[in-house]
Amino acid sequence: MTAPMMEGADATISESDALAGSAPLIRRPLDLSGRAVLLATDGSPCALAAARVAHALATQHHAVVHVVSVVDTRGAPIPPPLDAALALTDAIGGSELHREQERAVRAELSGAVGETITWPMRVVLGTPSAAIAREAKHVGAALIVVGLRRHGRMDRVMHDETTLNVMRTAACPVLGIVAEQGALPKRILAAVDFGDGSLVAVRAGRAVAGSNPTLVLTYVDSRDGSFVAQGEATIHGLGLQAGFAKLAHDVGEDGITFDHVVLHRAPSQSVGQALLEYADEAGCDLITAGSVHRGRVDRWIVGSVSTELVRDGRRSVLIVPPRHQG
């Protein structure tokens, strides 16, 4: 099941792309070196795990970490004039309250990573998902890192799905980290359909991986397994093998091991369930998914799978949004 590692011509970003920062992700890998990574924290166990992952991204991949902590104003009955005044105070960052909050957040994160951090930090007011997306745009983030916990029906009723909403609105990849994870992933399940989005997601997974990672290219076959003739099954299998080989070639660089697997799901089983079950069986510590398509049907399909992966909350998830630009 292991595909050979191959070297590819895309292993590094060209100088012009690095300077411009605007080349489509399908043409260049995601490289975090020297680029902003936004860590969103609320002090929860999963957010502190995300802080440890962000610290590892800075240490091992030379990312430049920025921090945002959002004071959620949704549940506070703040009159519009006062809300505007607080927002102005937030924007100028001059209040002692903000400075005290920043000191508290910095101390909390320093305790989580085991050393004093000097990352740029902002405490802002607003709806968490919208504020995080705005801050990511403000700092030019190549990646957002957030904590990820399990979401139930009550969370949806109360509109308390910050991580999922960030993934739906952000213009860059979003890495959701579960509380049990404190290091960069080493065995990554990359959900693929062999489209351009698959290459984007696999490359993004590589960009956040630890040293000598294994990328498990995973295709979920929605057919029931029956074929008109045996030859049709052979042709289908050969096509899948060619697709896996091409992805490995396009992403390949030194230090990566590629595995691949085809999952056959029962009619009653969703794509997300099949991916999660295999991730548990194979010991994968990250699931990646993504698309660069923007049609209505594509958004619905990709959105439903991503939503299920995020709401389940038992595996860290990297979602690459349907955008053409990195």
State each model region's role.
Residues 1-33, 46, 53, 72-75, ...:
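Structural beta-alpha unit
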Residues 7-9, 18-19, 24-90, 116, ...:
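Small/aliphatic-rich secondary-structure junction motif
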Residues 55, 107-110, 164, 203, ...:
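Active-site phosphate/pyrophosphate- and oxyanion-stabilizing loops and adjacent acidic/basic residues
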Residues 66-68, 120-124, 175, 216-218, ...:
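General small-molecule cofactor/ligand-binding pocket signal
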Residues 86-103, 234-243:
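A short acidic, glycine-rich active-site loop
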Residues 143-165, 184-185, 286-312, 322-326:
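Glycine-rich, Arg-bearing micro-motifs that act as flexible, cationic patches
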Residues 161-180:
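Short, structured interface segments
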